[in-house]
Amino acid sequence: MSNSPLVNYTRISPNKNSPRNHKIDTITIHCVVGQCSVETLGNIFAPTSRQASSNYGIGFDGKIGMYVEEKDRSWCSSSASNDNRAITIEVASDTKHPYAVNEKAFAALLDMVTDICKRNGIKRLVWSTNKKDRMNHLNGCNMTVHRDYANKACPGDYLYNRHGEIAAEVNRRLGASAEKPAENKPATGEVIHTVKAGETLSKIAQKYGTTYQKIAAYNRIANANLIRVGQKIKIPADTQAAQ
């Protein structure tokens, strides 16, 4: 079992179990709640009194640190079961909701997750907004979040709402076959559109010959700018796709 060649800094934490008892098949992304460096994160995980660690961390500058080797289980997600099968990644973030990460850190995260998947034979990354799917690895889901196992905001709404986008981009890099579009026309005539990377509500509305305001109202979307990749959006039956 190898470690990532993308690592810029290593400081192994004593807070771990060696070896892990499950093969690596899951990715768990966390927010640090602080725009810190990989060195600072290493200092945080160094004391045994901390009782916490992660496999990897990404600093505000996009550098990548390793604190627990991949062969070992980190103490990161409030779940031994999850951490035994997951690679855990802490990402430098703002200290307040929605705990945003900057572009350098996000770009490094995409590189990191892609590398982990390639080396561990994860052929496709699958995200679900359904907690049951995530916790039980149903329907191919292999991405989990800290809030699944504890009363925490982690990974923050910024990263949580981008998990579908992360999966889509990593799968593109992996060359994973695209899922069949989940667009269909039920008996009611209502169309279900699955949001794809790069789409906005305005673009979707234009495709169906309607307005984004109408779609937002129909789906009770309070903020038209907050839609995510993989989200299912209902298109009113009295609209039709532009020719």
Where are these regions (language model features)?
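Extracellular LysM carbohydrate-binding repeats and other cell-envelope/extracellular binding modules
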Residues: 194, 203-243
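Structured segments of extracytoplasmic/periplasmic soluble domains
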Residues: 35, 44-47, 70, 112-123, ...
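Cell-envelope and extracellular/periplasmic
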Residues: 33, 82-97, 114, 118, ...
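N-terminal catalytic cores of peptidoglycan-degrading enzymes
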Residues: 1-83
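Structural preference for beta-strand elements that scaffold enzyme active sites
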Residues: 26, 86-88, 142-144
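Extracytoplasmic/periplasmic, Sec-exported soluble proteins
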Residues: 19-21, 48, 77, 81, ...
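Basic/polar, cationic surfaces and motifs that engage anionic cell-wall
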Residues: 2-11, 16-21, 95-191, 229, ...
